[in-house]
């Protein structure tokens, strides 16, 4: 099974479970959790089921395209089930069968590992899923998002697509993966990995990025004053990526780091609070009448 066949199989499986199938969000982010289909929709009492692939940029993890399993940009397959069903683990194990992994033939373990994303004020209780000794998935039950308590238990399943594919295709380097039957992962992404690593570690202009952070922050706050949740959140994501790039460059000191994280978190909280307030004013339209 090549990389894109694996994605298609997961999309088909989870759409059959009632998930709407979305596309990646078109702004840089470090994880699928930061996509508004998770970050915002996890809040409030309305049900939400969604799945999507999310290219996730983590500048500090870049290795110039030379490391077989550390990447500037990797791909996550994100599933959100709100409310979380009682059989969520069984649903997950069934999904593995769809990509050729029979749980009865492998050592699959759920290892306790609570999760936190400080920049967006989110945390949850959860587990890493280990397949024959390799982490392939993160399970999380959100407790807070945007520093707001989650009203309805939300289950998040985040598959690490590259790791899963390396296991399925039995290769030791991500760059040897078959993207389809003709093109390898390396042919698609190796040059971008080198160039993005060169940029993050050596060539990015720190002064410019500090300035951009201030501009993005100012614009996010201005838009929130006008009640524009989505455009404001876009600028929160831009702030987060600018911060991550500065952090990878080594341009942010220890005391500065806490300050920048706090600034992003405060913006994210304001966006989250406004989103919930607006949904409430709309009468939480996704709720059935009996649940309101």
From Swiss-Prot:
<dbReference type="GO" id="GO:0006426">
    <property type="term" value="P:glycyl-tRNA aminoacylation"/>
</dbReference>
<dbReference type="GO" id="GO:0005524">
    <property type="term" value="F:ATP binding"/>
</dbReference>
<dbReference type="InterPro" id="IPR045864">
    <property type="entry name" value="aa-tRNA-synth_II/BPL/LPL"/>
</dbReference>
<dbReference type="GO" id="GO:0004820">
    <property type="term" value="F:glycine-tRNA ligase activity"/>
</dbReference>
<dbReference type="GO" id="GO:0016740">
    <property type="term" value="F:transferase activity"/>
</dbReference>
<comment type="subunit">
    <text>Tetramer of two alpha and two beta subunits.</text>
</comment>
<dbReference type="GO" id="GO:0005829">
    <property type="term" value="C:cytosol"/>
</dbReference>
<protein>
    <recommendedName>
        <fullName>Glycine--tRNA ligase alpha subunit</fullName>
        <ecNumber>6.1.1.14</ecNumber>
    </recommendedName>
</protein>
<keyword id="KW-0067">ATP-binding</keyword>
<keyword id="KW-0030">Aminoacyl-tRNA synthetase</keyword>
<keyword id="KW-0963">Cytoplasm</keyword>
<dbReference type="Pfam" id="PF02091">
    <property type="entry name" value="tRNA-synt_2e"/>
</dbReference>
<keyword id="KW-0436">Ligase</keyword>
<dbReference type="GO" id="GO:0140096">
    <property type="term" value="F:catalytic activity, acting on a protein"/>
</dbReference>
<keyword id="KW-0648">Protein biosynthesis</keyword>
<comment type="similarity">
    <text>Belongs to the class-II aminoacyl-tRNA synthetase family.</text>
</comment>
<dbReference type="InterPro" id="IPR006194">
    <property type="entry name" value="Gly-tRNA-synth_heterodimer"/>
</dbReference>
<dbReference type="InterPro" id="IPR002310">
    <property type="entry name" value="Gly-tRNA_ligase_asu"/>
</dbReference>
<keyword id="KW-0547">Nucleotide-binding</keyword>
């Amino acid at each position: 099974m090549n990389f894109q066949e694996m994605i298609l199989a997961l999309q088909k499986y989870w759409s059959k479970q009632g998930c709407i199938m979305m596309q990646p969000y078109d702004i840089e982010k470090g994880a699928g959790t930061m996509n508004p289909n998770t970050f915002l929709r996890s809040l409030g009492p309305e049900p939400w089921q969604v799945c999507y692939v999310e290219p996730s940029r983590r500048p500090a993890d870049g290795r110039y395209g030379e490391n077989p399993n550390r990447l500037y940009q990797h791909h996550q397959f994100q599933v959100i089930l709100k409310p979380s069903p009682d059989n969520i683990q069984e649903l997950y194990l069934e999904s593995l069968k769809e990509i050729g992994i029979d749980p009865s033939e492998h050592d699959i373990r759920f290892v306790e590992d609570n999760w936190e994303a400080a920049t967006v004020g989110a945390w949850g209780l959860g587990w890493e899923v280990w397949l024959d000794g390799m982490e392939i998935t993160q399970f999380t039950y959100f407790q807070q998002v945007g520093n707001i308590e989650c009203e309805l238990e939300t289950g998040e399943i985040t598959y690490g697509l590259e790791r899963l594919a390396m296991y399925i295709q039995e290769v030791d380097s991500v760059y040897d993966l078959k993207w389809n039957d003709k093109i390898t992962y390396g042919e698609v992404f190796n040059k971008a990995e080198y160039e993005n690593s060169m940029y993050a570690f050596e060539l990015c202009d720190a002064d410019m990025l500090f300035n951009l952070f201030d501009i993005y922050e100012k614009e996010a706050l201005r838009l929130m004053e006008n009640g524009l949740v989505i455009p404001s959140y876009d600028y929160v994501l831009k702030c987060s990526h600018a911060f991550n790039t500065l952090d990878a460059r080594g341009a942010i000191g220890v005391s500065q780091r806490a300050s920048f994280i706090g600034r992003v978190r405060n913006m994210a909280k304001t966006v989250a609070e406004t989103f919930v307030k607006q949904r409430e004013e709309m009468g939480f339209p996704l709720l059935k009448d009996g649940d309101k």
